[in-house]
Amino acid sequence: MAMTAEVKDELSRLVVNSVSARRAEVASLLRFAGGLHIVSGRVVVEAEVDLGIIARRLRKDIYDLYGYSAVVHVLSASGIRKSTRYVVRVAKDGEALARQTGLLDLRGRPVRGLPAQVVGGSVADAEAAWRGAFLAHGSLTEPGRSSALEVSCPGPEAALALVGAARRLGVSAKAREVRGSDRVVVRDGEAIGALLTRMGAQDTRLTWEERRMRREVRATANRLANFDDANLRRSARAAVAAAARVERALEILGDTVPDHLAAAGTLRVAHRQASLEELGRLADPPMTKDAVAGRIRRLLSMADRKAKQDGIPDTESAVTPDLLEDA
């Protein structure tokens, strides 16, 4: 089951005892998933959701809290509708329900944001408002670089009201318009986890956090592997460059090179990929890596001085781009 469906399934099964919170959830769900329609001169309240369990929860809450009967219509997937949708409709008592849930104000005008009683309600009401909004039009992506908890909103006023509700819960959410659609987005991983718990999806939060941690561990392992690979490549290039310079140094100095420096240089050329420590062990008698490095350094310095005096290419001339590219 996708993360969004997991959250919605868990929220739909959540038992809420507070009447105020249940009313806030219904009001928010109707606001974000529904609309008011005039049919034969009467106000009809409709809410379209993507899971049958959400539709049944809404129908039950409307009856338990307000005493009005709602009908659930199933819209099967066909044509441009990719999945089955469920429409909860209250026709007979639509206007009364709209007024009581705050979809209409006292003058009978549609409310653009969230109802005042929800905006000014308790923290539990703010949690319920988010729960209703997510059940209506929420989505949660898999943990990763672009992970997000997002709610599509019916307008900018509703989006700002939802941002305010998140702020009351200690969560930073942002309202933005994407391709003409108003959305509220939470991107921070810790904030997403906190909001899931606040809404009542603790089990899904644990699953999401586990996947998030696994992904972070994999990403860290990949970074370390890449880091090790890069270090190996740098070391290989440095060894090849050093061997090429030493080879050129031996050419420049010819028979004038001191025996102990020639021995160190010959080892470097013969074992191009070996570390200084390994070269020291191969020497006869064995030397420390510092002793090997010192002798090679003196060999290069002596060769570069002679090259300058003779006006010929120095040891650096042996290190060509093609040489490093092949390393």
Swiss-Prot record:
Molecular function as annotated in GO: DNA binding
DNA-binding region range list: 275-308
GO biological process: cell division; regulation of sporulation
Domain of life the protein comes from: Bacteria
Keywords from the UniProt entry: Cell cycle, Cell division, DNA-binding
Stored Pfam families: HTH_WhiA, LAGLIDADG_WhiA, WhiA_N
InterPro entries linked to this entry: Homing_endonucl, Sporu_reg_WhiA_N_dom, Sporulation_regulator_WhiA, Sporulation_regulator_WhiA_C, WhiA_LAGLIDADG_dom
GTP-binding found in the keyword field: no
Chain segments carrying region Disordered: 304-327
Family per similarity comment: Belongs to the WhiA family.
HAMAP family: HTH_type_WhiA
Function noted in UniProt: Involved in cell division and chromosome segregation.
UniProt name for this protein: Probable cell division protein WhiA
Organism: Mycolicibacterium gilvum (strain PYR-GCK) (Mycobacterium gilvum (strain PYR-GCK))
